[in-house]
Amino acid sequence: MTLTKAELADLLFEKVGLNKREAKDMVEAFFEEIRNALEVGDGVKLSGFGNFQLRDKPQRPGRNPKTGQEIPITARRVVTFHASQKLKSDVELAFDGTAA
């Protein structure tokens, strides 16, 4: 199962008591703030959860899988996520080895 933004809003509605519109707006605002920080080059640290960081990847050689022709893969900036040790250990404790 995948948790969606709509499901997060429903959980805020159920557990926190916000109305559905406020819950949806709060989820949207949360992700908008993360997006804004990353767009200006800032990292995002969520204590007990993890860090979103930007990483510059240099240009590198690639290959067209159809033709085999060598083509350059341009330099780019990517977003990376590193889970906190707490999140990793919580997930490990919850995992009982029966997941499909």
Swiss-Prot record:
The keyword Transcription applies. One of its GO terms (biological process) is DNA recombination. One of its GO terms (cellular component) is cytosol. Disulfide bonds: none annotated. Keywords: DNA recombination, DNA-binding, Transcription, Transcription regulation, Translation regulation. InterPro entries: Hist_DNA-bd, Histone-like_DNA-bd_CS, IHF-like_DNA-bd_dom_sf, IHF_alpha. One of its GO terms (molecular function) is structural constituent of chromatin. PANTHER family: DNA-BINDING PROTEIN HU, INTEGRATION HOST FACTOR SUBUNIT ALPHA. Belongs to the bacterial histone-like protein family. This protein is one of the two subunits of integration host factor, a specific DNA-binding protein that functions in genetic recombination as well as in transcriptional and translational control. This is Integration host factor subunit alpha 2. It comes from Dechloromonas aromatica (strain RCB). The lineage of its organism: Bacteria, Pseudomonadati, Pseudomonadota, Betaproteobacteria, Rhodocyclales.
